[in-house]
């Protein structure tokens, strides 16, 4: 790791501004999955042990950036944080302004303060407003720590602009260090072979960069979900009313051509579950891709033979990376394909198995397989960008390591 890490700082009796990623799923005021909060705890505990005053900042959801919206308040996070820390955690009513400055002034060494949602202000996401917003945030701390791996592919103020105000004093947190070192070592530098990547999700265009990068790394590329139908249509298959990105068809053909040149095996679904609508009670059937999907039906999950083929390849692999569900996992029975992939990864302890955050991580959690996977990343988009480029904007601006 060529960036400064939190262990290289001297934060005793100092204020440390920590960017965390507490963008957790919330329903009716309750957090459904707190893995992102749990993942940040090692850094928070480390700083508290060093008698630092810890100032946490995060975003949650997609508020309009026009001020406080109760729906997106970080208040539900406070209860979970307090449970892990065993003491009261004040929530500043805002992240900037007089109330925030007062809250920061009152925080003492060995305690934690959580600032309210960064995205309540346009300064977090809009570059033209970054300077003033970042200047105020950076005034709160003596040191800056980025532990928000899942957000570090975005050039937002708290991730990209703020650390530049801390020359020699901005560092990666323990979660960030773990993510970069695991993904870098096992997927980029020296993956054990055979190396298989599984990509799902809807759009080819949004993942074309990482797909082309993976074609230089992997032995097998398994494609499913909406993306899979775009590739199938590019091969002239009848996909009925399935989700297809028409503008991605040429990209798919390019990928298929490059894969052939590089001797990478691309594997697409050979059968799929189809129905007239994506609802739990809908009547569904399985059809083979060679047979073709009728025009009034859409593919919603991979079929039984595809599951068997995918799992056969996974079982024969030494490194597996999975990003994106292979079906509409939110709606049973179209979750069966994704659940089968999760269980297949879990029963392969001798392999390095990496789940690239986002929906795939949610599937693994639903399947109860998280503990059996080598690494579940806290960042979907961030893990893809790191695999594509080998770096993230939010880490490039951190101070160089002194070691």
Swiss-Prot record:
Name of the top EC class for this enzyme: transferase
Subunit-level organization: Monomer.
EC number: 2.7.2.3
Gene that encodes it: pgk
Gene Ontology biological process terms from the UniProt entry: gluconeogenesis; glycolytic process
Keywords assigned by UniProt, alphabetized: ATP-binding, Cytoplasm, Glycolysis, Kinase, Nucleotide-binding, Transferase
Record-linked InterPro entries: Phosphoglycerate_kinase, Phosphoglycerate_kinase_CS, Phosphoglycerate_kinase_N, Phosphoglycerate_kinase_sf
Family, as annotated: Belongs to the phosphoglycerate kinase family.
GO terms of molecular function: ADP binding; ATP binding; phosphoglycerate kinase activity
Compartment(s) of residence: Cytoplasm
Short name of any one Pfam family annotated for the protein: PGK
Catalysed reactions listed for this entry: (2R)-3-phosphoglycerate + ATP = (2R)-3-phospho-glyceroyl phosphate + ADP
Organism in which the protein naturally occurs: Chlamydia abortus (strain DSM 27085 / S26/3)
Binding site for ATP: 207, 299, 330, 357-360
Protein name: Phosphoglycerate kinase
Residues bound to substrate: 21-23, 36, 59-62, 119, 154
Lineage per the UniProt record: Bacteria, Pseudomonadati, Chlamydiota, Chlamydiia, Chlamydiales
Pathway field: Carbohydrate degradation; glycolysis; pyruvate from D-glyceraldehyde 3-phosphate: step 2/5
Any one GO CC term of the record: cytosol
């Amino acid at each position: 790791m060529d960036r400064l890490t939190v262990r290289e700082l001297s934060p005793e009796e100092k204020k440390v501004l920590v960017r965390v990623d507490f963008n957790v799923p919330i329903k009716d005021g309750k957090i459904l999955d707190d893995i992102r909060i749990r993942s940040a705890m090692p850094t928070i505990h480390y700083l508290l042990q060093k008698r630092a005053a810890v100032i946490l900042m995060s975003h949650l959801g997609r508020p309009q950036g026009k001020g406080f919206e109760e729906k997106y308040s970080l208040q539900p996070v406070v209860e979970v944080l307090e449970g892990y820390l065993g003491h009261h955690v004040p929530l500043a009513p805002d992240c900037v302004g007089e109330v925030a400055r007062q809250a920061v002034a009152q925080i003492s060494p060995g305690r934690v303060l959580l600032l309210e949602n960064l995205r309540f202000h346009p300064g977090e996401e809009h570059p033209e407003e970054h300077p003033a917003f970042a200047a105020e945030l950076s005034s709160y701390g003596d040191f800056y720590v980025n532990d928000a791996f899942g957000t570090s592919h975005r050039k937002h103020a708290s991730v990209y602009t703020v650390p530049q105000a801390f020359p020699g004093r901005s560092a990666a947190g323990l979660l960030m260090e773990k993510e970069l070192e695991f993904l870098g070592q096992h997927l980029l530098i020296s993956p054990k072979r055979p190396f298989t990547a599984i990509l799902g999700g809807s759009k080819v265009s949004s993942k074309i960069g990482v797909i082309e990068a993976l074609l230089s790394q992997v032995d097998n590329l398994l494609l499913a979900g909406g993306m899979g139908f775009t590739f199938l249509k590019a091969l002239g298959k009848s996909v009925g009313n399935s989700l297809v990105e028409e503008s991605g068809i040429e990209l798919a053909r390019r990928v298929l051509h490059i894969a052939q040149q590089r001797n990478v095996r691309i594997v697409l679904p050979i059968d799929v579950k189809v129905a007239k609508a994506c609802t739990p009670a809908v009547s569904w059937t399985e059809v083979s891709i060679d047979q073709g999907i009728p025009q009034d039906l859409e593919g919603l999950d991979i079929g039984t033979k595809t599951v068997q083929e995918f799992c056969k390849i996974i079982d024969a692999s030494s490194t597996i990376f999975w990003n994106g569900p292979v079906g509409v996992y939110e709606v049973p029975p179209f979750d069966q394909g994704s659940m089968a992939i999760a269980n297949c990864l879990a029963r392969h302890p001798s392999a390095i198995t990496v789940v690239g955050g986002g929906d795939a991580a949610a599937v693994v959690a639903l399947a109860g397989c998280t503990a059996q996977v080598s690494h579940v990343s806290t960042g979907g988009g961030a893990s893809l960008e790191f695999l594509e480029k080998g770096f993230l904007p939010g880490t490039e601006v951190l101070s160089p390591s002194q070691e």
